[in-house]
Amino acid sequence: MSALAKPADWVDSPPLAPEGPVLDLDHLERMTLGERELEREVLMLFAQQSADLLARLEKLPREGASLAHTLKGSARGIGAFAVADAADDLERRLRQGLPVTAEVAVLAQAIGSAQAAIDERLQAL
């Protein structure tokens, strides 16, 4: 007789690394109609807003889903799709009442990568 192993408890897989650039410059150019000054303004606004929203999210967890939703829209607007995807995952889990420690970390990392890409882009403009 062989003993059957007990099935392991379900554990969520870590999020996959997004494919493509951190900042989709083609999308950004379409959204800003090719106007470099508008692009600069939008990128600077997103950089500030994303840092502020992340800080607020950590201090005000009850507002987390709304903050994540706001960040998701802003990120999509500039072509920071990894940030948008991370914010979407966080928003969904918060609305379901699920733990979000890993999702907050993924979002913070995505924002950090986007900030670096924005800094690089602003220097190139």
What is each stretch, according to the model?
Residues R92-R95, D119, Q123:
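Two-component transmitter module helix at the DHp-CA junction of histidine kinases
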Residues D89-E91, L98, A102:
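Short alpha-helical "patches" and their helix-cap loops
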Residues P21-T70, G77, V100-L122:
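Long, amphipathic alpha-helical coiled-coil segments characteristic
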Residues M1-G20, L125:
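Intrinsically disordered or compositionally simple regulatory linkers and C-terminal tails
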Residues D9-V11, R36, G73:
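Short alpha-helical transmembrane interface motifs in multi-pass membrane proteins
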